[in-house]
Amino acid sequence: MKKIVIVGSGTIATATARLLAKKCTHYFDVSLIARHLATAHQICADVLRQYGVVVACYQCDALDKSRLVPMLCRIKAELVINLATPDTHLEVMKACLESRCHYVDTAAFEAASDFNVPPPWYSAETRLKKAFSQAKLTAVLSIGFDPGIVNCFCAKAKQDEFDDILEIDMLCANNGTHDYFFATNFNPSVNLKELCEVTSYREAGQWHTAPPFSRSRRYAMPGVGEHLLYSVGHEEVHSLAKKFPKARIEFWVRVSDQFRQTLQTLERIGLISWDKVNVGNVHVAPIDVLAALMPAPASLAPSYKGQVCVAVVLKGRKQGAAHSMMYYSVCSHEACFEDIGAHVTAYTTAVPVVAAAQMILEGDWNAGTLVHPEELNPDRFLARICELGMSWQASSLSAAQVSKGDLINICADDTPA
């Protein structure tokens, strides 16, 4: 069996461990490394209880490369799935180089102090590309759903449907409801920072930025209906800009009025801040206090009801004529919970990262260098995520459907991929 290591112990790491235990028992020998051993023990005990699979657990701060390298060597890790916070990425990547194992993650690196990082992103990771190439090791960056699967949708579209792609809009709409007034689907500090930062998008070969919640569109989407989506800075815009330099590229996400108004109120009173303040004898960042008071993201799963649609809408040219396509997936919170006890966000990040790990170790995605998902062959990967539990579809769109009216309706004429 292939030896892989999960680094991290949050919502996504838990879902990934469960998915590996349920669907890849005879494929992987899994270990888990977490900053807090008690959390690691809890995940491993959960996996053993539910699936009868033993996952070895270890304690190490992912930022402590001096301890992480010998630990990976003792485990004889062949691949690391880094699901810790984004500030750990560079140190874990360097640890993989020193211990000679492949690497995957699900987001871009950002230091804990970073805020409003100017585009383009990924410059820190790119500096390690030569080292991965020389070592003939593979690092696949940001292989979740969005970013990740959506990047592969774009590669699939270019391969099969377009001579030239001129516009790429990535959409994420969660119409789910749960028992909590204000909660995030993954690490609150990371999720809230993303929404409070300026948005960045690509147009006419140039980078543009705009204040948060200042750009919006209303879409009617498969499975979730009509929603107002906001432009938010997101990883896939920055990597896809290299593959499609002429295209207008932007990411849009649904944020409910209640969530947005609450977030903006918390920001105005200073609770969405990473600058530490003194409270009695304690020196603490307000965001850490808020995160401690918010529900744990994994706790949303049992009460979550509804669906999530993630889609990529592409416009361009095919054989000299205008052409538009949509690639998308609709997932149910209830179905994801029934499968591995996770909500959609956790489930649809675990599935692609496991698929990528399999394909690297099988050789199909063993690029021997540092790459983004859109640089790899999408066909086997998109088939593999279906095998692991995620379906997707593709459909042509008419000119009327993608026109910039008050409502962009992309629901009609669905065709299975």
Question: What label would you give each PLM region?
Answer:
Residues A107-L137:
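Rossmann-fold NAD(P)-binding glycine/threonine-rich loop
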Residues S9-G10:
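Glycine-rich Rossmann-fold phosphate-binding loop(s) that bind the pyrophosphate
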Residues R35-T39:
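Helix N-cap at the beta1-alpha1 junction of Rossmann-like dinucleotide-binding domains, i.e.
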Residues A13-T14:
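N-terminal Rossmann-fold NAD(P) dinucleotide-binding loop
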Residues Q159-A417:
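C-terminal catalytic/substrate-binding lobe primarily of soluble NAD(P)-dependent oxidoreductases
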Residues Q50-D64:
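Rossmann-fold cofactor-recognition segment
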Residues A62-R74:
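Conserved Rossmann-fold cofactor-binding substructure of NAD(P)-dependent oxidoreductases
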